[in-house]
């Protein structure tokens, strides 16, 4: 049984990004906006700041205890017009009453490093990828690195952050894809029928050995907190001696995801330098 670790992939991608920045003379910059004081969001923001500094990307966190939707959109408009800012990212979760997709709709597609704007999502659907969501990209990075190409895949998630873009990105790469969700009647029959299972349901231990086969490859996108420990959506203890391969949580998809946000910043900076 193989453990599919993400740290080495993230390090190699970071080294590549550092080389691109040094050779090109780019000075990429990312503006993070956080509203409130959610600890998980703060940890993720600090991780991007640390990784950015190591790679050569200026990452700045702008925090608000309280701000109206109107004022937030005005601030985004100012950042959209600022040529010194290459990427804009809104940290989740947002306070009640804020419409995340209305917010990202106001971020220019070439600064939308979360890649959740209608334009960037549409480019994915048309197989014209530009900036892509970091977590789906991380899943594909793991498949590429460990040599799982053009297989059958079942995704247990249909969100615009993971399941929907990932399904289209996999189709673009000649995978055969099934998507399950909360209304799927027999998820286990779907997951057992695919070589690769990607799970992202927000339920610790959801995926167990009854839902997979000994030849399954499990990519766990879930992040849950149980007794002050971070665990995934797959029952790692149950599966680790049963399936062919599995990503750990933490240490699997997560390290690559943060680096992929910064990869989008570099792509955005290159585009803006050459086209604006």
Curated annotation (Swiss-Prot):
GO CC, alphabetical: cytosol
Residues involved in NADP(+) binding: 157-159, 182, 223
Pathway noted in the entry: One-carbon metabolism; tetrahydrofolate interconversion
Keyword Transmembrane among UniProt keywords: no
Family: Belongs to the tetrahydrofolate dehydrogenase/cyclohydrolase family.
GO biological process, one term: L-histidine biosynthetic process
The protein's role, per its UniProt record: Catalyzes the oxidation of 5,10-methylenetetrahydrofolate to 5,10-methenyltetrahydrofolate and then the hydrolysis of 5,10-methenyltetrahydrofolate to 10-formyltetrahydrofolate.
Keywords associated with the record: Amino-acid biosynthesis, Histidine biosynthesis, Hydrolase, Methionine biosynthesis, Multifunctional enzyme, NADP, One-carbon metabolism, Oxidoreductase, Purine biosynthesis
Gene3D superfamilies assigned: Leucine Dehydrogenase, chain A, domain 1, NAD(P)-binding Rossmann-like Domain
Molecular-function GO term, any one: methenyltetrahydrofolate cyclohydrolase activity
UniProt cross-references to InterPro entries, sorted A to Z: Aminoacid_DH-like_N_sf, FolD_Thplmales, NAD(P)-bd_dom_sf, THF_DH/CycHdrlase, THF_DH/CycHdrlase_cat_dom, THF_DH/CycHdrlase_CS, THF_DH/CycHdrlase_NAD-bd_dom
Coiled-coil blocks: none
Pfam families assigned: THF_DHG_CYH, THF_DHG_CYH_C
PROSITE patterns in UniProt: THF_DHG_CYH_2
Reaction catalysis annotation: (6R)-5,10-methylene-5,6,7,8-tetrahydrofolate + NADP(+) = (6R)-5,10-methenyltetrahydrofolate + NADPH; (6R)-5,10-methenyltetrahydrofolate + H2O = (6R)-10-formyltetrahydrofolate + H(+)
Identification of the protein by name: Bifunctional protein FolD
NADP recorded as keyword: yes
EC number, UniProt record: 1.5.1.5, 3.5.4.9
Subunit note: Homodimer.
């Amino acid at each position: 049984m193989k453990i599919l670790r993400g740290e080495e992939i993230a390090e190699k991608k970071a080294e590549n990004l550092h080389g691109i920045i040094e050779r090109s003379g780019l000075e990429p910059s990312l503006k993070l906006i956080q509203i409130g004081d959610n600890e998980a969001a703060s940890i993720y923001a600090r991780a991007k700041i640390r990784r950015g500094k190591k790679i050569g990307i200026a990452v700045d966190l702008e925090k608000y205890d309280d701000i109206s939707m109107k004022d937030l959109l005005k601030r985004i408009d100012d950042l959209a017009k600022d040529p010194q800012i290459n990427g804009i990212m809104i940290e989740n979760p947002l306070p009640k009453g804020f419409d995340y997709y209305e917010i990202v709709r106001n971020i220019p597609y070439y600064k939308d490093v979360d890649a959740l704007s209608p334009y960037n999502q549409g480019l994915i659907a048309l197989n014209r990828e530009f900036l892509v969501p970091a977590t789906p990209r991380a899943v594909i990075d793991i498949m590429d690195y460990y040599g799982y190409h053009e297989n059958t895949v079942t995704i247990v998630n249909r969100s615009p952050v993971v399941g929907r873009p990932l399904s289209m990105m996999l189709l673009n790469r000649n995978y055969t894809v099934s998507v399950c969700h909360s209304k799927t009647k027999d998820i286990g029959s779907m997951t057992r029928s695919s070589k690769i299972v990607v799970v992202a349901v927000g339920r610790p231990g959801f995926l167990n050995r009854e839902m997979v086969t000994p030849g399954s490859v499990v990519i766990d996108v879930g992040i849950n907190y149980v007794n002050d420990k971070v665990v995934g959506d797959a029952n790692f203890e149950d599966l680790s001696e049963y399936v062919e391969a599995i990503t750990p949580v933490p240490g699997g998809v997560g390290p690559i995801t943060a680096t992929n946000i910064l990869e989008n910043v570099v792509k955005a900076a290159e585009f803006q330098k050459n086209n604006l």
